[in-house]
Amino acid sequence: QMRGSRSKALAERALVNCRYSLAAFSTGERRRRPPHGDRQCAELALHLQQSFEAAILTHLYPRSQIDIYVQILQADGGNYCAGVNAATLAVMDAGIPMRDYVCASTAGLAEETPLADLSAPEEAAGGPRLVLALLPATGQIALLQLSARLHQERLEAALEAAGQACRALHAVLDRGVRERLREVT
Amino acid sequence: MAAITMRLPVPRRAVGPSAPRGGEKHLVAPGDTITTDTGYMRGHGTYVEEEKLIASVAGAVERVNKLVCVKALKTRYNGEVGDIVVGRITEVQQKRWKVETNSRLDSVLLLSSMNLPGGELRRRSAEDELAMRDYLQEGDLISAEVQSVFSDGAASLHTRSLKYGKLGQGVLVQVSPSLVKRQKTHFHDLPCGASVILGNNGFIWIYPTAEQKDEEAGGFTTNLEPVPLSDREVISRLRNCIVALVTQQLMLFDTSILYCYEASLPHQIKDILKPEVMEEIVLETRQRLLDLEG
């Protein structure tokens, strides 16, 4: 159903509405964050919306709204990725048709070695950071974001590392989903 | 006052399927290719990409001749003509009420589909529009039948019979729509002393059986007399039984609810919500249902 303003309802597909927030106790020191004013949260919510609009088959739900609210309980690097993976499972559990799983992972470089799934100290170190959201079956990229500068030659290696991590994640998520299906049917 | 019991969370053991299903079910997740054969027509839960039929929800594949569809575990209610639903009024608009029925879009109850008090048959005038709020307000529960479905999936309801209308005192249980079995009638008077309406949309309404069966008002006047304690106990027990059946994923219909109620009689009403007691009751119910099937 459409909640909030009716005028934003799209006639031929569903609107995906995402909200992203960090709990106060999620990082090392407890910080009280403004409820919705945080710019980083707004940006990550927009990224979530873009990734899921690419994955959910929205044309099957005209004039409706799909809400995805993500709250991070423990932040240790890769917040957005954890949010994407959790939201994928949530959307699948709700029975909303999707093209494929959306698996996300960060990748970076430390002195020529590509690293996958960076932790918070590694992210804070200031090196280049690549965030990749992938649809594993077809290999289509839903979102690709790079912060800090990266040499063009190193891009391939980092992308490959992130892709591998995403595919490994897909295997884990898939196993969980199938176990649950087997349990219930 | 009884003390509060607390317990630590423990992984749930699902009661496994007792009867072996005929054949292995083909379980899929989004992104899995179901078949590359172009001879099949695609149904719900699938989409076509580059001549491959790919699943879009996580569930079991159902094949009917040439039609392939994937049935998901948990979906919103999809209205079908002739279904009984129980819904809650969310909005009062110009000539209609918007009813929430656990579906993708709010269902619509048009003023012309509603019986006037007194059972008159006349064209609805402007005064009727202004008096809409006297009949049904936001937050009221109604039982209705689906008359038709709009192109975007919203259902249009009607209460054109005396058995539909505003619901009075009782208990609502919300379950997944896939657990309510399709039957000839969804209004049941259980012999234990309460009545139950099994809405196809997953809303189940339990209420005390009315003594006199003739109501000329068409279900508008709500009976606000105090309900006796014995009836309340029966209703609470039924509600806990339904919750127990739902957690073990058993189909809901009048016989299963009745057997579950009888199996739960030796326990106290509040004990039914404990996991071990729930498992025991549901096992017994399942056993009796299997015996019934023969």
What kind of feature is each model-predicted range?
Chain A
Residues 1-185:
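Polyanion-binding surfaces on beta-sheet-dominated domains and ring/shell assemblies
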